Amino acid sequence: MNYRQLFLLQNVNLESNYLLKRVCLSLKLSPCKLTRKFHHACPSSSKVLKYFRITGCLINFGKQPANDHHLWGHCGARLKHTQSDLIDRFKNANLKSVNEENLKKFFSELENHGNIRQWLKDKFEKDKRAAVCPTTTKSEEEKLENDFEYSFDLEDFSSENFRQYDRGDLLVFYRGSEGIELAACTGTNVWNYSNVLTSINENGTIKEFRTSRVLLRCPNVFKKLKEVQQPLSDVSVPSDVLPFTIKLLKKISQRAQDLSRSHRNEFLRILTEFNIPNKLDNSASFSDLLKFVYKTSKPSPYAKISLLHFLLTESKHFLISDHIFSEIQKVYFLPSSQNDSFDDVVACLRQKSTPYLSFIKKARHLIQVSRDKYKLPISTEEIKPVVYSQVTWTEFEKKLLRYLVQEMIAKSIQSLPNTHLCQVYKEVGLQTHERGLTSDQFAKFLTDIGVWASWQPPRLFQQEYSIAGLGTNPQLDAVYERECNHFKKFVKNELKDSLESQRVDLRHLKAFAFDSSSTKEIDDAISVEELGMSNSWLHIHVANPTSTVDIRSPLGTFAERNFQTIYHPNKIVYMLPLNITQKYWSLDSSSTAQRALTFSAKISKNGDILDYKVRPSFISSVIKYTPQQLDKALHSNRSIAKDIVSGPVDEETKGVSNDHMKDILRIYELSKQACFSRLQKFAFVIAQPTPTVELLPNNVPYNLGDLNHPVYWSSFPTISLNVSEGYSLAESVISECMILAGRVSSLFFQEHKLPGIFRGQPYPIMDGVRRKAFETLLSNRSSWGLVETKYSLSVMPLFESSHLASTPVSHFSLGLKDGYIQSTSPLRRFTDFFTHHQIQSVLLKTPKNTIPDGILRGKLNLYNQKEKSIKTIGRYINRFWALKYIERLPKVQKNIYHGYLMVSELSTPQVMLEELGVKAHIDILPDEAFRLANTRQAFTIKDVFPESNILLVALAT
């Protein structure tokens, strides 16, 4: 698809939404009510209404129109057919509120232009500048708006629906490699999703962005637009306000460019004034940088934009953290990089100089050598490098290769063509067609010439994902190993326990740890304590490293820098040195009295917390079971199994001792009561298939391209892919206990007014149709809140990711409104480590040791950014290896897979393949996509691109 077609697609979609809105306004009905009544009268006729939404999608899939003439002709033909059909069907529907004259008047507007195709083109040109308000009275608009909003009648639900954006705000959007774009907010488009903003840029073009793309928001800049008296969800711009808005946008853009030129030297001084080497939190607030550059505490919008543009263009020096509410708090200084200037390399590429042609000759030879001699067998043995010493790289060739690798890594995250990669690929004889070059193809070329490994995920080598210990950055890896060895000597003697005198002896209780058999650090265990009739306490015991290590110590700083234990299929990087963790803090260490911080709750029959305690404790040696053993034990109990399994019940507990079953069943009952409380507040868990990738050998080396010769490899690792069908019963029980500890932790922090790291998830704003879909989701939850994927398809795009906050916030999917603080993994998550430190300052009555709220707020953006980066790259790596597994399947095994077709107006249709646990894109025509939306279908694999993280499927024939 070319850029012209993409441009048409975007604007025709706006056109179709505009037409649908005009119909609904004429009928004084919302789209959801109109569709329901229309479908009830004649079920097959609902497709007519869908025309308005899918017309613009025709060029997005498969058969694109050859040119604009065909595009507009097709739109016109569909609309002409719809006119008479729609009026007839409205008559048959017998809708009392339908004004047939208004409907005919609407369609007469088309006929007055004579040529429907020309009318659409004229209308398109107008809407390309801005959507003009329909001629309706204010009362009609407000009445219709009330119908659209369809406020929830769920308990306190509407109180969560606050808006961070308003009409008239100046928005700065991040466009990736294209930089930033200025726009004026015109509202929230109810025809799409509530977390999508509609805006107009300085060219007068209407565009839609997700709120996560907003880098900066300056409120009330466009006062005339702000004063427009229409609902926020009406995203059109009155014609008298439009010219002023565009003119002001251009003025702001021009002033920002002028400031960028005049303050260039001040911008560069930021690096010398604020960048302090070897400082952990090497950052500065955005407001401090503004004061430094402009010498004022109240900079103008264009001053902010000018500085922001500089920080983004110098991305090798700066990192702007995730902006939860579109207000940049911190700017982080990245370590000085060793990036070379590649101007001489680019010049040689353009001129096709002799050194460059010599490289091309070597590359052709190596491609042939690779195909003849180095075909990788699959093996579980250690992977060893095989150096091809017959070819030696010159200094120019090494630099050229570094440049090509850098460009290939950048290519893996963007679809823009790269002329230099295309040139090299073509001149070595690999470009045999006119299709665009993919990062997967170029990675294969680099593998063939011995400077890359076929199992290297390109995005893992991006600077923002550089993680010490993963093997992608030798300098960071060396620092990580050196510090681990240093701490091993530092804590050689027994560490002093600061909470020793306060610990409660709970060794009389059985403590159960439910972890995988491969887990090397046990950081939580569960006990139950019966104190009489219906008086039970559930105890969650958590490893307590902060009692022996201060958060401000070098080891605490080491944990903060690593932030989390990283679990990748080929590598695990521990937040704290593993040998120290296993010896001193893991709950399965050799000590007879394990030290823990115990979170206890007394739970009512309705699952409410009647009382809670947070105490340092001694617990007995933990009793370890795997989740699989727990699951089989729970299913073997008749009173539990009769509601969750069918067929004969296995009487055996499969490895769980009979002496332990009473406590385990009581843990099950109490955790289910706690879950019941959250279910009343609309908690849910979407039970999607989840892939788990295992590699043998599990320590797979990377080719860092730093040798003088090409390097090949002895074998390819063995990949096994295991797919879980969703949450098991055991996982639900364990998860509920951990959530309960988070609830108790939140209560403790609020009672003692402690600065803490709360976790929240915003409540989405839903229109009537999606509200109904969400109610369907809730009504199909299991007794543990699990929801099958098919019930979540239409509302899943509305759900935002969770985030960290310094004050108690609601968590949508957990059904928690009174705050939630994760606290059960201090050996694996620094935020939990921080939580334990704060609690300890209260227990020891040492308020001076408490981390102040101001310092915490200053670091939250960094923590959010780190958590997001770790989560993003973790998903990418797991998917990369899953796609490698699929790519290497024998052709005969690429058979039929199944899944539900997910259709969204903001993205191409996708499928969650149940047997593989991965999402895939599908090439399908829009009419067929809407017809099959949310239905389970059979699919075949079409193409696999692991480096780009893309899987394409087609409907099985």
Swiss-Prot record:
The RNB domain extends over 503-843
Q: Which reaction does it catalyse?
A: Exonucleolytic cleavage in the 3'- to 5'-direction to yield nucleoside 5'-phosphates
Name where it mostly resides: mitochondrion
- What is this protein's expression induced by? Up-regulated in cells metabolizing nonfermentable carbon sources.
Q: Under which main EC class is this enzyme filed?
A: hydrolase
What is one Gene Ontology biological process annotated in the Swiss-Prot or TrEMBL record? mitochondrial RNA 3'-end processing
- Span-the-membrane segments of this chain are none
Its Enzyme Commission number(s) read 3.1.13.1
Q: What does this protein do?
A: Required for intron-independent turnover and processing of mitochondrial RNA. Participates in 3'-mtRNA processing where it hydrolyzes single-stranded RNA or partially double-stranded RNA with 3'-single-stranded tails.
The UniProt family comment states: Belongs to the RNR ribonuclease family.
Protein name as annotated: Exoribonuclease II, mitochondrial
Lineage of the source organism?
Eukaryota, Fungi, Dikarya, Ascomycota, Taphrinomycotina
State the encoding gene: rpm1
